[in-house]
């Protein structure tokens, strides 16, 4: 069985990136929660 984590910068950005988060209402909720928590990094 192959390892499940096959890193790809493009996929990472498209799925978990800042612009991907901003594109949906729920994504914006994620960012606001992370801001409220005081995260140094909001998204990938």
Curated annotation (Swiss-Prot):
Keywords: Ribonucleoprotein, Ribosomal protein
InterPro entries: Ribosomal_bL34, Ribosomal_bL34_CS
Molecular function GO labels: structural constituent of ribosome
GO CC annotations on file: ribonucleoprotein complex; ribosome
Pfam families named in the record: Ribosomal_L34 (PF00468)
Stated family: Belongs to the bacterial ribosomal protein bL34 family.
Protein name listed in UniProt: Large ribosomal subunit protein bL34
Gene name of the record: rpmH
């Amino acid at each position: 069985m192959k390892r499940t984590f096959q890193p790809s910068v493009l996929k990472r950005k498209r799925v978990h990136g800042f612009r991907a988060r901003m594109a949906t209402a729920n994504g914006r909720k994620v960012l606001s929660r992370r801001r409220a928590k005081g995260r140094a990094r909001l998204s990938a």
